[in-house]
Amino acid sequence: MLQPKKTKYRKAFKGRIKGDAKGGTTLNFGSYGLKALEPERVTARQIEAARRAITRHIKRQGRLWIRVFPDVPVSKKPAEVRQGKGKGSVEYWAARVKPGRILFELDGVPGPLAASAFERAAMKLPVKTKVVARFGDTSHLGGN
């Protein structure tokens, strides 16, 4: 699973995800993409599950790009432990995703296959998403 090799600080504040994504909102690599429509933290496990769903559905043809990286450590205290005594240990890593952010990109596969692969991936993610195409019109993809 994805996680940083090295970080400046071991633990992070929870924070809030405000506003729309400034960067990473256009397709830069592939012809088709999966775009987030709402703010949410996406865990490394969810990204990996979505990646597996896509690669299995397209039967390893074409090329897949993951456009988000889980760089936020999420800490958790163990079960049945009293409050206080410091912050809990890091439980998992997550990516803060803002609306408009491209999560995955695909190239080298037909449009309808890309759309169905992204729909399967969307089921693994905690955000509402939509399929976008480099050349605008997504009516030929079906589903949307």
From Swiss-Prot:
One Gene Ontology cellular component: cytosolic large ribosomal subunit
UniProt GO MF annotations: rRNA binding; structural constituent of ribosome; tRNA binding
Keyword annotations from UniProtKB, A to Z: Ribonucleoprotein, Ribosomal protein, RNA-binding, rRNA-binding, tRNA-binding
Cysteines paired by S-S bonds: none
GO BP term, example: translation
InterPro entries: Ribosomal_uL16, Ribosomal_uL16_bact-type, Ribosomal_uL16_CS, Ribosomal_uL16_dom, Ribosomal_uL16_sf
Transmembrane segments: none
Family assignment from sequence similarity: Belongs to the universal ribosomal protein uL16 family.
Function text: Binds 23S rRNA and is also seen to make contacts with the A and possibly P site tRNAs.
The protein's assembly and partners: Part of the 50S ribosomal subunit.
Name the record gives this protein: Large ribosomal subunit protein uL16
Organism field: Erythrobacter litoralis (strain HTCC2594)
Taxonomy of the source species: Bacteria, Pseudomonadati, Pseudomonadota, Alphaproteobacteria, Sphingomonadales
